Amino acid sequence: VKASDPIAIAMDIDAAGLPFLKNLTPPAGSKTVEELRDIVRLAEKPFIVKGIMTPKGALKAVEAGASAIVVSNHGGRVQGCTPATAEVLPSIAKAVKGRVKIFVDGGIRSGVDVFKAIALGADGELIGRPVVPFIYAEGAEGFRVYMDRIVSQLRDTMNMCGTPSLADIGEDNIFIAK
């Protein structure tokens, strides 16, 4: 991995129970802050911890030295009873905002979804599955078309909500059911 000189290294912490990760040596599973800190140190690059679903988990990642976290539940495939990332994002952002970059995935399908995620505390959003058909059909051009649509939708939403910049987007721009 180091030979490829990546800009960052990430570790997925919430998939240890998936069938293809069983019987690994060393075993996949929970890591203490100290173990995670050792991994971060060995990376020698900005380190991203993916699979954060609680403020406690986010604080552990910060304590271990992570540069960023990804609020992610693998689309509920790891445990079907996990909440949506949008439900937990505000409390996680409240716990660690400004100390680490906060990314979110899961359910991001449009520029409106990107707007909502920013309003809930994300610094950035990860989109995977929805873009695959565009890339499969048209390669890099398909990716560009998809991303242009997301950006256009985000700009339209920002204009409709009176938010001239990403920094102006906040919880007061969206309705949160209690």
Report residues per predicted region.
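Alpha/beta enzyme core
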Residues: 1-104, 111-134, 176
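C-terminal extensions of enzymes
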Residues: 131-132, 138-178
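Beta-strand segments within the central parallel beta-sheet cores of soluble alpha/beta enzyme folds
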Residues: 103-105, 169-170
